[in-house]
């Protein structure tokens, strides 16, 4: 539904989710569109149920579709990047947040890590910022990426910035923060900055472009 909203001008997935969540049988606790789910539990549990279903002769059609759709979110972000900055090789791209959720250093099955992996493979010069997860990220990418502890240094001279984790720190990003970006192009997978009038080309998952 978020991807549908993204294709329709002036449409916001958060409005749709809030309406759906009014139904007490559903609630709104987990209706948070983003770059895909990750972490140490949900992906593992999903795979376990799929494997069990296959072993006992039950075709897990819906579960396979959920897993495939989850992985497609990163592909959609990659498409946005390529469409706006062209060839990825040699471009400086900043990833803001690699922990699978805020307030943790856990990067297991993180969509941010998956995105970095794809960008590094294509030859991007990736700079990573995360308030807590940099040490665990270094163990994965070593010298294949750069790491920084400040948002301003992460954004300096970059041609694209992607917010992947909903850290409170990123809510403070403003026109002063992005002043020294080489190309002011931002992908906000969490819609953290959707209410700010940034002097930048801005895309957010689940948010249709303004007319």
List PLM regions with ranges.
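Structural/interface elements that position substrates and couple domains in central-metabolism enzymes
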Residues: 2-211
């Amino acid at each position: 539904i978020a991807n549908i909203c993204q294709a329709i001008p002036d449409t916001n997935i958060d409005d749709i989710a809030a309406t759906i969540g009014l139904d007490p049988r559903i609630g709104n606790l987990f209706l948070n569109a983003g770059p895909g789910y990750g972490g140490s539990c949900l992906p593992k549990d999903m795979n376990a149920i799929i494997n069990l279903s296959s072993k006992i002769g039950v075709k897990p059609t819906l579960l396979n579709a959920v897993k495939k759709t989850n992985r497609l979110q990163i592909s959609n972000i990659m498409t946005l990047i390529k469409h706006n900055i062209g060839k990825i090789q040699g471009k400086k791209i900043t990833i803001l947040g690699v922990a699978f959720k805020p307030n943790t250093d856990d990067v297991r099955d993180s969509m941010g890590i998956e995105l970095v992996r794809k960008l590094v493979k294509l030859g991007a010069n990736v700079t990573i910022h995360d308030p807590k997860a940099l040490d665990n990220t270094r163990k994965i990418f070593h010298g294949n990426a750069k790491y920084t502890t400040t948002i301003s240094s992460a954004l300096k001279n970059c041609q694209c910035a992607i917010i992947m984790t909903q850290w409170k720190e990123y809510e403070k990003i403003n026109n002063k923060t992005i002043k020294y970006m080489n190309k002011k192009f931002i992908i906000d997978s969490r819609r953290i900055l959707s209410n700010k009038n940034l002097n930048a080309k801005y895309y957010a998952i689940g948010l249709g472009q303004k007319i």
